[in-house]
Amino acid sequence: MDSEVQRDGRILDLIDDAWREDKLPYEDVAIPLNELPEPEQDNGGTTESVKEQEMKWTDLALQYLHENVPPIGN
C-alpha cells in the first residue's frame, strides 16, 4: 500500500547503541555576535541573526533606495 512506510534497512547500519548514547559536551561554544538572534524579542519575535537580517536588505537592494531619490521640484 502507498500509505504504509517502507523502512530502509541501510539506515540501521548507521545507528547503533553507541551512537544513541553519545552526548554532546556541556561546554560553552563561542558564537560570533552577528550570528546570534536579536536579544530583544519585543521587536516582532524574529529568530534571524543580525547577519541574516542584513543579508535580507542586500537581497532586496533596499540599501540603494535613498541614493536613487528623484529631485523634488522642477
UniProtKB/Swiss-Prot annotation:
GO cellular component annotations of the record: anaphase-promoting complex
UniProt signal peptide: none
GO biological process terms held by the UniProt record: anaphase-promoting complex-dependent catabolic process; cell division; protein branched polyubiquitination; protein K11-linked ubiquitination; protein K48-linked ubiquitination; regulation of meiotic cell cycle; regulation of mitotic cell cycle
InterPro entries linked to this entry: Apc13
Pfam families in alphabetical order: Apc13p
Region of interest (Disordered), ranges: 33-53
Pathway terms, separated by semicolons: Protein modification; protein ubiquitination
Localization terms from the record: Nucleus
Main subcellular location of this protein, as a coarse class: nucleus
Keyword list, A-Z: Cell cycle, Cell division, Mitosis, Nucleus, Ubl conjugation pathway
Superkingdom of source: Eukaryota
Keyword field contains Amino-acid biosynthesis: no
PANTHER family in the cross-refs: ANAPHASE-PROMOTING COMPLEX SUBUNIT 13
Function: Component of the anaphase promoting complex/cyclosome (APC/C), a cell cycle-regulated E3 ubiquitin ligase that controls progression through mitosis and the G1 phase of the cell cycle. The APC/C complex acts by mediating ubiquitination and subsequent degradation of target proteins: it mainly mediates the formation of 'Lys-11'-linked polyubiquitin chains and, to a lower extent, the formation of 'Lys-48'- and 'Lys-63'-linked polyubiquitin chains. The APC/C complex catalyzes assembly of branched 'Lys-11'-/'Lys-48'-linked branched ubiquitin chains on target proteins.
Similarity remark: Belongs to the APC13 family.
Subunit relationships: The mammalian APC/C is composed at least of 14 distinct subunits ANAPC1, ANAPC2, CDC27/APC3, ANAPC4, ANAPC5, CDC16/APC6, ANAPC7, CDC23/APC8, ANAPC10, ANAPC11, CDC26/APC12, ANAPC13, ANAPC15 and ANAPC16 that assemble into a complex of at least 19 chains with a combined molecular mass of around 1.2 MDa; APC/C interacts with FZR1 and FBXO5.
Identification of the protein by name: Anaphase-promoting complex subunit 13
Taxonomic path: Eukaryota, Metazoa, Chordata, Craniata, Vertebrata
